[in-house]
Design a protein with these regions (language model features):
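A boundary/linker detector
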Residues: 1-116, 124-130, 136, 260-295
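Short cysteine-rich clusters marking metal-coordination/redox-active sites
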Residues: 119-123, 181
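Short hydrophobic "helix-edge" motifs at membrane interfaces and signal-peptide entry regions
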Residues: 130-131, 173
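A detector for short metal-coordination/catalytic motifs
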Residues: 136-137, 143-295
C-alpha cells in the first residue's frame, strides 16, 4: 500500500489568488535554510515574471540567507500586475528499489566497496571489510538501472571517466554509485533524502530523520577530486531534483511499499497501486538489465 508524503508537511506554499489551495509543501528539517528553500522552489514553480516569497504575517519577502527556514504558510507573489505562476508539469521517475544481484553488477559493487569502505551517508565504517563481509552494506546506484534509456537520452555517459570498456554505457560505473547501509539505501531510492552537490554536499531529509543524517555532509572518501573513481556531481544533482519533485510538488508522490518477504507478489502490489504502468516498465527494465551480458 502506497503512503502519503504530504500528511507530515509543516511548510506550505500558495498562489495568493488561491490562498487555501497549496501548490505544494515540505516537511521541514533543520538543514533547510531560506536560501535552499528558494532554490528548491525554482524546481517546482514556473512564472511569467520575477516573484517574491512571503511568510504570512511578516512584512518582508524571504531573502536568500543561510538562516533556518520557518514552518508556516508562504505566498508566492509575482512582481508585476497580472503576473501568473504555475506548477511545473515535470514529474519524478517511478523508481523501483534496487537489487544488485547479477554478474553485471559485480564489478560495480566491488569498485564502490573498495573506494568507500563505509556508509558515506552515516559515516559508519564497515569493520568487517577486511574479510569481505558486507552484511548490511549496499552499493547503491544514484541513477537507477531501470532507467538506463533515460540515462542515455540525457547524454550522462559523457560525465563518466572511469568505465570498463568502450561498450559500457557507464551506468554501472562506480562513479554512479555510493556505499550505504541497506536501510539508508531504501530511503535513498524512495527519495526520502538527497545530497546537494551545490551546497557543499549537504544531506537534506524530506521526512522524519530517524538516523540523524539531515545536515551531515557526504563523506569525502567518495568525492575526492584526485580519485578517478569519484562520484559524479551531475548524478547527485539529478537525484536531488528528483527528490524535490517527489516531496514538494502538489500533494507529493506516493511512497511505495518496499518490504517484500520471499514469495511476495511484487507484480500484484505494483499493479494495484499508483503509477502502475510506469512502475511495471521500470521493474521490467531493471530485471532485463541484470540478465544482459557483462560489458
Amino acid at each position: 500500500m502506497a503512503m502519503s508524503r504530504g500528511v507530515i508537511r509543516n511548510v506550505h506554499f500558495y498562489d495568493p489568488s488561491r490562498p487555501i489551495e497549496p501548490l505544494g509543501g515540505l516537511y521541514l528539517n533543520p538543514s533547510v535554510t531560506r536560501r535552499k528553500f528558494l532554490r528548491m522552489l525554482e524546481v517546482i514553480i514556473c512564472a511569467n515574471s520575477p516573484y517574491s516569497v512571503w511568510l504570512r504575517g511578516t512584512d518582508n519577502p524571504l531573502a536568500p540567507t543561510d538562516d533556518p527556514l520557518e514552518s508556516g504558510h508562504y505566498d508566492i507573489v509575482c512582481s508585476i500586475p497580472g503576473g501568473i505562476i504555475w506548477v511545473t508539469d515535470e514529474r519524478c521517475i517511478a523508481r523501483p528499489f534496487s537489487r544488485t544481484v547479477s554478474k553485471r553488477d559485480s564489478r560495480f559493487r566491488q569498485q564502490v566497496r573498495s573506494r568507500d569502505r563505509k556508509c558515506v551517508i552515516t559515516g559508519i565504517i564497515n569493520p568487517a571489510a577486511y574479510r569481505n563481509d558486507w552484511t548490511s552494506f549496499v552499493a547503491a546506484h544514484i541513477f537507477p538501472l531501470s532507467h538506463e534509456q533515460l540515462f542515455m537520452r540525457l547524454n550522462y555517459p559523457q560525465y563518466v571517466t572511469y568505465r570498463s570498456g568502450e561498450t559500457d554505457t557507464a551506468i554501472n560505473s562506480c562513479q554512479n554509485g555510493l556505499l550505504m547501509r541497506s536501510h539508508i539505501h531504501k530511503q535513498f531510492d524512495s527519495f526520502s533524502f538527497a545530497i546537494d552537490p551545490d551546497d557543499n554536499y549537504k544531506i537534506t531529509c524530506f521526512s522524519e530523520d530517524l538516523d540523524g543524517i539531515d545536515g551531515r555532509f557526504l563523506d569525502p572518501v567518495c568525492r575526492d577530486p584526485g580519485d578517478e573513481r569519484r562520484v559524479i556531481d551531475e548524478f547527485l544533482r539529478w537525484h536531488f531534483r528528483q527528490t524535490v519533485l517527489a516531496n514538494m510538488k502538489g500533494n507529493g508522490e506516493p511512497i511505495f511499499e518496499s518490504d517484500f518477504p520471499d514469495g511476495s507478489d511484487i507484480v500484484g502490489e505494483i499493479v494495484s497501486g499508483p503509477r502502475a504502468a510506469e512502475r511495471m516498465e521500470a521493474e521490467l527494465f531493471s530485471r532485463l538489465n541484470r540478465i544482459s551480458p557483462v560489458p
